[in-house]
Amino acid sequence: MRSGLISFNWDDIDSFSEEQISYYLYLEGKSIKVISKIRNIEEAVVQKHVINGKIKYRILSLSKNCSELLDNIASSVKQEKLTLLSTMENERKEELLKFINENYASMTSKHKETAIWIIGELKDKNQKSILIKAAVNKSVNVRRMAVSAIGKIKDKSFESTLLRVLDDENDQVIVYAIKALIKNEIKSAKEKIIKIKEKTNKEYIKNACEEYLKIVNE
């Protein structure tokens, strides 16, 4: 059975959760009442299963392919995005990351932001080249998302990229870079951070610099 990018086989029912069983029956067109009788559980329980299923799988059910999936993720709220990624099967994640890798260059800025966010949330080190390019993109939001993703991945091989980003013209991007340096435990930026702290009159930048310097000096 398939509904959008949701696919399941009843032969695998032993691996399904109680919630999945109810939701999959619902996808087949069965009513709450019918599912309740089939499963011998209360309608209120079935209703809860279906509601949770809709929350978890709505984006997948609306998407016929990875292109539509990325588009639907881009237009969803953050919590729904997080729920999707936390419940998505590894095979589907790999397909989505493969699509991003092959199509990133032709994406709009909005979709690039979403693609980079996904890379960061899934902590995919295989997309390093995309993140390095994104860190110097003309779009401030793309650069900010790229640096944030680098911080989540925690890979010291991004050192040169983060050091370069400290010269960015946007203050938010710089702060994200400082936070990423902290998360990646990169201590080679001390001199640049000191200069940034001395030049800025913005408290949130000074605070980020102080946090970094405190860790470096420990």
Give the location of each predicted region.
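Short inter-helical turns and helix N-cap capping residues of alpha-solenoid HEAT/ARM repeat scaffolds
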Residues: 74-77, 107-108, 138-139, 169-170, ...
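Key DNA-contact positions within bacterial/archaeal DNA-binding proteins
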Residues: 44
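Short, solvent-exposed alpha-helical "recognition" segments
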Residues: 13-14, 47-65
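Structural detector for internal amphipathic alpha-helices that build alpha-solenoid repeat scaffolds
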Residues: 20-24, 37-38, 48-57, 71, ...
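Helix-turn-helix DNA-binding elements, focusing on the entry/boundary residues of the two helices
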Residues: 32
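Short, amphipathic alpha-helical "recognition" segments used to contact nucleic acids or chromatin
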Residues: 14-29
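Short, Lys/Arg-enriched anionic-surface-contact patches
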Residues: 1-18, 60-61, 107, 111
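Amphipathic alpha-helical scaffolding segments comprising HEAT/armadillo-like alpha-solenoid repeats
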Residues: 59-72, 91-105, 124-136, 155-167, ...
